[in-house]
Amino acid sequence: MVKYALWWLSLIFLTLVSCSSDAGVESVADEFSVKFDLPQMVDVTKGGEYVFMVENGESPVASDVFILESGEGISYICPFVNISNESFTVRIPAECETGYYKVYLKRDDRKRQIGQIYLSVGEKLNLTVDACTTVYGRVASEEGGIKGVVVSDGVEVAETDEDGIYQLKSDKKWGYVFISIPSGYEVSSDGVLPQFFQRLKANAGVPERQDFTLTKVSGQDTYKVLMLGDMHLANRTADLSQFSDFTADLNNYRSAHPGEKMYAIALGDMTWDLYWYSNNFAIPEYLNTINKQVKDLQIFHTIGNHDYDYKAVNDFDAESKYINYIAPVYYSFNIGKIHYVVIDDIDCDSYDGTTSRNYEKRISPEQLSWLAKDLAYVDKSTPLVVVMHAQLFYPSESDGFKVDHDVTNTAQFLNLLKGYKVNIVTGHTHMNFNVTPESPVTQGQEIYEHNTGAICASWWWSDYLTPGIHISLDGTPGGYAIWDVSGTKLQWLYKATGTSEDYQFRSYDLNQVHFSLTDVPQMPSNISATVKNKYMQYVNAYPENSDNEVLINIWNWNPAWTLTVTDEKGNNLVPEAVWAYDPLHVAAVSVKRFNSASLSSTPNFITEKFPHFFKVKAGDADTDLTITVKDEFGHTWTEEMQRPKEFTTDAYKLK
């Protein structure tokens, strides 16, 4: 409780908006003394009453007017029910809704602001609040309370009873409470943001009520989830224009599938922390941009390393802006028969307030503790989709896949997932790779990792430098993943922005692909050997040759896919899996980044060697090929490759 006393402060002129006859009267502040405890928040029923405790016998008089003013400037007069030297009771108007209100007391033409209060307005609960409870409430739909909804403050986890009521013994560390949206229900939206959480209003030791109202929906067993990889919006390199191409593609895809339920999950790095301050483009600007361009789609969000405030000096403060604007950094929800978990796997406790941004890829012990409690309510037969920003594993030329997280932390995380069928979805790399349960790195667990390509591809650089080419460091086109869910069955597909779902691979006639130092005439002749050698890796990979080899980039490849290549005579050519640099990305980005007279160090965002490539050798330079790729779900894509096949950036622009 906070004590408020009325004494002379200032002269206030205020037009009172009210349903009463006092509306429109100008009131002048003057000194009159009333003392009572004004709580931070109160729980009231609609049209109900509340008792305020008076101090030192200084209570209001019967002719005083008690006023609540909403954030929209609407004032409500609360009639006195009774007044004594110990307390007074007011009736809260039925029109008042949950929210913050300024509290005024008016005596004759004198009016004084007392302070601010938060009203939690709801139905009366059949509940005795436990002694240690600090957060409680009801989860309900139009049909009444919903039993079995999991509720958490990020530390403690509880479940609603048969009336939809929950209680939490919360220290209120995170300042919010959230529900794990139950199957068959949806929450309301604020733009693209699903409102599955409530921000806490009172101090840690003060009990407060937070209710959740859900909408019952049907047909949730069959739906799509759009996995949206790194966006990196910063209002530079024409990113906002390119982003509108993505949202147009997204909206066109949704329009082409009318009547199908769709949700989306952003995989992190919606923003670019380096430009929050220098370019005045941060989380609010991201939300403003996407809310203008995408309507009627709930996007659950994941925090990425570029969504933290680099000016902070610890993890808690670094993620506070994200929490304030978007959502909790870890939570869970259910859609149909699938349980989704969103994890924060970026640890910023080593931040020093500078752009050094020293972070670690790890899941905090607090999250692991919460996850164990969350999964205690999830049957082992329920498939899990776990979403986090940074990759858990990473391909290695020598070792297949390796753990790319804190090793001890990862072991603890995987141990919690034992017995479940788990699909982990990540971003961060801006490239595409897939880990399947057959990989030794999963240690025999039924775990998949889908590292999903970026919406921004090469941080928006490829289309900026070479208009019409929007690809990432491994040659994956900028785009997003489409997951089809039917009951407990999941299917996935990667879709490139600006083209159909049938664009799943790219072929190169290596007789036509070659790079040399003549491609970078502006690169300084005295550039360091380190920088020059970085460029020479592309020259050495693709010298001028006539070996009649064809390179095929299948960016969403996994071991369950098949590749078949036949020549025009019907001969089967045996593909060889290779690590390679994508030639189109070399030409569209790397060559142009190295071809600079001001070059002094190795440029960022250049082509990386990656494993989802295959080579075949044709009989001669003119032999045409039929290339057929098939995924594990039976989707088949074919190219009739006419050779020689031209290699220029213009030839590879999407038509």
Model-inferred region functions:
Residues 61-64, 133-136, 141-155:
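Short, ordered, surface-exposed loop/turn motifs in non-cytosolic proteins
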Residues 22-125:
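Ser/Thr/Pro-rich low-complexity tracts
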